[in-house]
């Protein structure tokens, strides 16, 4: 029984972390059709922002939940203004540019921080489930993911910003004709996507550690999740994370981490074969 | 001068330069340069395989390294079991081609297209990476070849003169072989693209629906293109395993896959010479950035100049912004505008660019 | 000799070069020494300290008047964690730079890429990393420790302290696989039991399910042979689950990548490790070495690692052999090394073991204590017994392979 509860928590955690690392990419890709290969590095920067802030005496909660998203969001806006905005409509070129950006950011962080960076350890301690102990921080990550997704839902569904965003996403020309200023929407979107990635990177930093090349561990997985989810940002990310996260974690628990990883990837292939437009191409079509 | 003549002149030029390169490099350069050029030639064949699939076939394949790696692994495993290189070489082409055919059938007949193709191919290569990576234990072997996991397979025997296993091909021989293979691939693809088949796949790339309504089955043509590309990549993988006598799972990794795409973008999609130039240029740059590092400096400048990813990243970003079409098409444009200032008929060439190169 | 254009160009270039150098202060050209390490990409955490140590060793040699009256010049290659570049740079070092020796390679994979290239082009090779053992090649010298030298000591020490039931977690590659087999062997020999061995690919960061499995198995301690940046998250998640207090841990891989500095004291204090070198070793040679290292690279240098010391000692051994041979000629230096050359290094006495080309050296058990490594016990002059069981280059000088040692 206690094992079942523990496993359930771990499956939820896997889903939550997958959703967290993917949602920033989903917004950038879903709204702008930009394949951001520097996504992993945005997550990495979030981790560094949190570390630097805590080492300057800022509370770890503020560092993770406020400082990291703001810093990475601003970096995102700068990147959009200096590089990405010249490349709209050229999906392939953004791939090359963001790959370059990813190398650049790895090089820059190595130059600034070296490669031995003191990390932050997970706060909140641990708790007992029957015979097992597990980290209370796991529950915190799950909560953060739930809150982030809920906020995105509210913003998209009921605010003017959300309306404009959905409009631009569905038909940028039409939105433009109706008086929306697409460049501004794009800059804000890119910044928001980056900020969410920064938040995710910071929240996961105490679990996964922070080093300059950690981005590689994230980028492929979040990319696969986003595409597997399909066009709708929110329901796509949630449904794909739920599917891949639980498959991955259960397979890992029953067999080995390698098999868990392979099971996730294989599930992605089968999913796309069955639903060539991703999950939300078929289900939840009216979702966000 | 008309388009056809210009095209032939270009083709002739490539041939002359290629043959001159083939003959002259080993005479004028030290062995280390010859060896370096050898790997550039091999990678250029890999670049051409994606140039065909993506640049002409319009299939965004993010996992070309899967076929490259399969070729290398197949050769290595077959070589340890057979000991004579003719069959391993053939297998190293056939296995990746068959794999590409299966995967292609799975994708194209499932009507998967666009970015979803990219994700599936990426996922496939990552599965191969993860699987091969976890074969470190002694229980993982195929015949007498141990798979070796992360460490890969070292000490792969080189190709030999067909039929005579006591006559291995030496280092200069490998250079001749790789360069000749690259030239053959280039001209072979030019022929293929000039044929009816080539026209049809470019037509499908331009407008799949229209091609379908005209009675061509895009799925079959894409499948064929994909399989040819897989075979070429496998062949390059076999040569690569020969060059370093070594193969490891990183050959399937994300960095390797992205690299191939970057060669093609940098050189120019929709050309054949472009990806070759892009590949050699990027490879050369990576090597040059890693060579002769300043050591032990703790000041800022040393940190920046010794920082290969930093510099490489800046160059790539600058490149996208300044040379958006890729190297060869941009040079082509410059050349044409020079020509246009002399004769007006050059202007009519513009729309045809997609088929040249 | 057949004179063709290439040899002609070569000889004219040589004449020109000779002309250029005759005006310099040194009687002859410098001796080229190549370093081939990952200085960027995922493995730079290991490579950078190694190159720093090599730089210092060479600068010291030059300050003392060079070798054989010639300056030593470091040619430093960054392989960017890319295997293809290992091949290319090994070729360049041997053929273009014509180096007297190559120091380099971090993972066993990179060593097996370099080794045949340098064999082919007859260039001496030093591999300075701790590894799984078993390489037998007359052209190569190995200055790192192998499992028989460290695991053999640490297993009984940890079992005496904590108990007999051991759970092993290891990186899923050659080194992790072989090391965990050695752990199993010594645990069994000491009357204990290995309850499970779990392997993790080097990029795994989620250890939640594994931690639950370990809790279910209830071992007396955990043995970690985890490697690299991603695996640091195991220690984090272990501590976050509150396990550090109830189940202790021992390792022969921890701290090589400065894990004890990256993690907080709460996450790793009390862990036992075993290596050849620790920065806090108390002996005069080490104290003066640490002082000059800090003078050169700054006192805020995080930690002088095991691998850095291996590289430093590797260069010193080679330099000693060059002096003895009176030449940088490859065969003469190999023969000089095979006389069993030894040096007084910061880690203690280090001697080349002629039949295996590995080193006889001191090992120490230490405990992680507040970002430092506190030495608990010393074992003098450990032989590379694992490799010695399969390799004898005095009897079979032409042997050239990596043995899989039967455990």
For the regions a language model picked out, list residue spans one by one.
Chain A
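Cytosolic-side transmembrane-helix boundaries in multi-pass membrane proteins
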Residues: 112, 170-184, 255-288
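Pore- or pathway-lining transmembrane helices of multi-pass membrane proteins that form conduits
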Residues: 41-45, 87-110, 215-227, 255-275
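Extracellular/periplasmic helix-loop junction at the C-terminal end of a transmembrane helix
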Residues: 99, 103-130, 253-260, 280-288
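Membrane-embedded helix boundary and interhelical linker motif in transport proteins
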Residues: 9, 31-78
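Helix-loop-helix "hairpin" substructures at the membrane interface of multi-pass membrane proteins
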Residues: 14-15, 133-211, 234-239
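Membrane-interfacial amphipathic/re-entrant helices at transmembrane-helix boundaries
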Residues: 1-20, 49, 58-65, 90-95, ...
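Alpha-helical transmembrane segments within multi-pass membrane transporters and channels
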Residues: 25, 58-102, 108, 239-244, ...
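Transmembrane alpha-helical segments in multi-pass inner-membrane proteins
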Residues: 59-70, 187-197, 201-202, 207-269
